[in-house]
Regions:
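Vicinal oxygen chelate
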Residues: 21-24, 74-112
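N-terminal beta-strand motif that seeds the catalytic metal site of vicinal oxygen chelate
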Residues: 1-27, 33, 75, 116-119
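Short glycine-enriched loop/turn motifs at secondary-structure junctions
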Residues: 9-12, 67-72, 97
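Residue-level marker for the onset of beta-strands and adjacent loop->beta junctions
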Residues: 14, 48-49, 73, 99-101
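Non-catalytic surface loops within mature trypsin-like serine protease
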Residues: 20-22, 56, 66, 79-81, ...
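Conserved acetyl-CoA-binding loop of GNAT-fold acetyltransferases
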Residues: 31-38, 91
Length: 119
């Protein structure tokens, strides 16, 4: 038996939520690769939630609430020119045995931001 889904919606984007001690921790790393804070919300209790958006439309959320995830996390970005982006971030991309070229950035809370492209 084959199940056929008739979707009336489109998943536009998957947005990771990165747990951080302070929003500035995520901002420091993400700004190196072209992201900027597009909005933030402070629900009280000295907690903050923010969205960082890249000019190409990709978003990453950061949350000071440890209830949003276990953390630290790894966020993987597939990019079209990893060497150019690595140079912008002050990093060096390297070929991996699994057929990609990648570099990593790590924030002060231990979250890893990994950027790569297929070889």
């Amino acid at each position: 038996m084959q199940i056929v889904f008739r979707l009336t919606f489109v998943i536009e984007q998957v947005v990771p939520v990165v747990p951080v001690s302070k929003i500035s921790v995520a901002e420091e790393i993400l700004s190196k690769v072209g992201f900027s804070m597009s909005w933030h919300h402070n629900p009280g209790q000295n907690l903050m939630y923010a969205e960082f958006t890249h000019p190409d439309g990709i978003s990453v959320h950061a949350s000071e609430s440890r209830g949003d995830g276990i953390g630290p996390v790894v966020v993987y970005f597939r990019v079209s020119n990893v060497d150019e982006l690595a140079a912008l971030a002050g990093a060096t991309a390297e070929d991996q045995t699994w057929g990609t070229r990648e570099f990593w950035l790590r924030d002060a809370d231990g979250n890893a931001y990994r950027f790569g492209q297929y070889l």
